[in-house]
From Swiss-Prot:
Effect of K152A: Severely diminishes the enzyme activity
Gene transcribed to yield this protein: NGK1
Protein source organism: Saccharomyces cerevisiae (strain ATCC 204508 / S288c)
Family (UniProt): Belongs to the hexokinase family.
Active site location: D196
Name of protein: N-acetylglucosamine kinase
Extra remark beyond the main annotation: NGK1 is phylogenetically distant from other know N-acetylglucosamine kinases as well as hexokinases; and the amino acid sequence identity with others is only about 20% or less.
Species classification: Eukaryota, Fungi, Dikarya, Ascomycota, Saccharomycotina
PROSITE patterns: HEXOKINASE_2
Length: 433
């Protein structure tokens, strides 16, 4: 037996879970239900799901904007057909987040819509073009919709305090249109600002048949799903009521289900056995499931293993990210490592992904049980995230470890589509005028 085969067997015993997936599913289910009843940072109700919705065929356009980082995306979307009529994107070169930050963004959007015929000049039309606007905002917001923090190189200013993202964007539209009314003859009604997890869930709900779960596995790990409204503890029902539009009679709610932003990255503290190479600071203990499944932390565990066993030098120049791990798992052409170690490195990458897939399969099955959808005998999951999307091995291992048939459907453009769907559904319920 070679040294490398001995090392591979040692790592296999350290990495792959010793417990059965049945036991892990049971423990995850208990933790999900406990967090639903008691936790204030996970298993959070985001919006109510009406039992019946009247369909509409809007003449007004839905403009969706995706604030996801340094590249801003926007689109004109028609529903209920889910047609992206026009989409565009541009880099955000201004990183000071103040009123001028939003003004510049809105001016660029209006300019490009006008150039493509969606906004007319005042002398070209007798009636202003009307748009409903929905926004996906991927940075943390407080319950009032105010910005809590912004990373990725953005610098917040005090001018944001006391204003919601919805108010800031609506104010910028008003300013830009009023100052350029001859060029931008239109009205913009900002309807919704939602986070990316909810956007994925709404897209999944709208596109996938019999779906119960939407999944995000990119640099982070999260899931959204519906549970019966009666599952909510009183303090979460009260908090949800405060977020509802004034058009709701908050005392006579007639809903059976509520959409949950689960923040599943926090799950597994007493279930997932982290190894020394999995420790990347306090975050590993706070978010164990995200630590072992996401495209941000799993690659760093691989790097730590290779350093620990002197397979790579400390000054190794290659960045360990999700893309690299996906290529290693698929045994792509070696362009980074010494050939004598390459087969072992690929094997270690696959072991880490197998562990990730085991826990993803377990959490998905636990969610499936508490949503009450287990009688379908399969789980239809709409998902996003480049880490999962780019790894066929990861997706196949999730299916391998699951005792229920899993269908994974990638939801392209979900941040844009989900925002439009939020406005579409709520306009059907007469929340949007």
């Amino acid at each position: 037996m070679t040294i490398e085969s001995t090392l591979a067997r040692e790592l296999e015993s350290l990495i792959l879970p010793a417990d059965s997936i049945v036991n892990v599913v049971d423990q995850f289910q208990e933790e999900l239900l406990s967090r639903l009843q008691t936790n204030t940072i996970s298993m959070l109700p985001q919006c109510l799901v009406p039992d019946k919705r009247s369909r509409w065929n809007p003449e007004d356009k839905i403009l969706t904007i995706d604030f996801g980082g340094t590249r801003l995306k926007f689109a004109i979307i028609s529903l209920p057909q889910i047609v992206i009529e026009y989409n565009d994107a541009f880099e955000l070169t201004y990183n000071i987040v103040d009123s001028n930050f939003f003004n510049q963004i809105i001016y660029t959007i209006c300019t490009r819509l006008a150039a493509n015929g969606y906004i007319k000049k005042k002398n070209e039309s007798s009636e202003a073009s009307k748009f409903f606007v929905s926004v996906t905002f991927s940075f943390p917001l407080n319950p009032e919709g105010e910005v809590v923090a912004m990373g990725k190189g953005f610098v917040m200013t005090d001018t944001l305090q006391g204003s919601t993202v919805k108010q800031l964007i609506q104010s910028s539209f008003h300013r830009i249109i009023s100052e350029n009314i001859e060029e931008f003859f239109c009205t913009m009604n900002v309807c919704h600002v939602i986070n990316d997890a909810i956007a994925v869930s709404l897209t999944s709900k709208f596109i996938c048949e019999n779906d119960s779960i939407s999944l995000i596995i990119g640099t982070g790990t999260n899931a959204c799903f519906e549970v019966p409204y009666g599952y909510l503890p009183p303090f979460k029902r009260d908090a949800l009521r405060e977020t509802l539009p004034s058009s709701y009679n908050k005392e006579t709610l007639n809903f059976k289900h509520v959409l949950i932003n689960s923040e599943i990255g926090f799950i597994g503290k007493n279930v997932i056995a982290l190894q020394p190479f999995d420790i990347h600071g306090a975050i590993s203990y706070e978010m164990p499931l995200e630590c072992v499944t996401s495209g941000k932390w799993l690659p760093l565990s691989l790097k730590n293993i290779l350093l620990q066993y002197n397979i790579i030098p400390k000054n190794f120049p290659v960045e360990f990210n999700g893309e690299l791990v996906c290529q290693l798992a698929e045994d792509c052409t070696n362009a980074w490592f010494e050939n004598e170690h390459y087969a072992l490195i690929c094997q270690i990458a696959r072991l880490l992904i197998k562990r990730a897939a085991f826990y993803v399969a377990a959490i998905v099955q636990a969610i499936d049980i508490i949503t009450g959808c287990k009688n379908y005998n399969f789980i239809h999951i709409g998902y996003v995230g480049s880490f999962l999307h780019n790894s066929n091995f990861y997706r196949e291992q999730i299916k391998y470890y699951s005792s229920i048939h899993i269908k994974l459907q990638f939801l392209n453009h979900s941040n844009l589509l989900g925002a439009a769907i939020a406005t579409y559904l709520n306009k059907s319920d007469n929340q949007v005028q």
